């Protein structure tokens, strides 16, 4: 695994970006690879780093599934306390914290990913940089920003993995946004949500049925995609 520190233009600070290379990358020097970009990079590889206490366990998952196409995995760290702002393109409509407003930095974060991180990866690694071979994955708020970037940069991202979307935080704004977008029908999207979603942070942001809110957000996203073609 390789580690890079890339400067985020709107903060001027460095952000850790880790790259997991496929087996025999150094030997197969003529081969190029598809790329999967993950948000919440601290959650991708090791549970001890995860802010939720458990990770995606990408490395053992790849080892257990040798038939999966070899790929380059890019894990982009979140901004810690700034995560709720960066992973939402709109201000939250839901919040039980008086005087606090979250969200609204998603457009700038998307530009960092697509104009700084992706070009860096394509320049420094043997990637298949085209849309067909570029994917993006995120969960919860990471799922929100995956949805947004996937729509805003449809011409560059061909596959999305959206897990436990938290669009209920800015549902109306997202619905208006997707209604205005012309959707490309060949973009592949995997949507997943469980029936026991939510954590302590969610409970500070919404007083209602949070578990159902996650389910409803995923269903609305699915129906919006169908309606949009």
Please give the residue ranges for each predicted region.
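Non-catalytic cap/lid and distal C-terminal segments of serine-dependent acyl enzymes
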Residues: 1-229
């Amino acid at each position: 695994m390789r580690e890079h520190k890339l400067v985020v233009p709107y903060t001027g600070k460095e952000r850790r970006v880790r790259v997991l290379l496929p087996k025999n990358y150094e030997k197969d020097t003529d081969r190029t690879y598809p790329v999967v970009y993950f948000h919440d990079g601290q959650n991708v590889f090791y549970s001890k780093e995860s802010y939720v206490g458990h990770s995606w366990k990408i490395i053992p998952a790849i080892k257990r599934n040798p038939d999966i196409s070899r790929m380059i995995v890019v894990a982009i760290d979140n901004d810690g306390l700034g995560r709720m702002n960066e992973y939402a393109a709109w201000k939250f409509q839901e919040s039980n914290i008086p005087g606090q407003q979250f969200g609204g930095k998603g457009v700038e974060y998307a530009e960092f990913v697509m104009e700084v991180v992706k070009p860096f990866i394509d320049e420094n690694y043997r990637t298949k940089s085209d849309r067909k071979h570029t994917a993006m994955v995120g969960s919860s708020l990471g799922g929100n920003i995956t949805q947004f970037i996937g729509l805003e940069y449809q011409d560059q991202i061909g596959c999305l993995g959206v897990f436990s979307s938290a669009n209920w935080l800015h549902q109306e704004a997202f619905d208006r946004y997707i209604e205005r977008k012309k959707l490309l029908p060949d973009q592949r999207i995997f949507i997943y949500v469980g029936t026991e979603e939510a954590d302590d942070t969610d409970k500070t942001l919404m007083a209602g049925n949070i578990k159902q809110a996650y389910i409803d957000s995923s269903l609305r996203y699915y129906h919006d995609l169908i309606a949009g073609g």
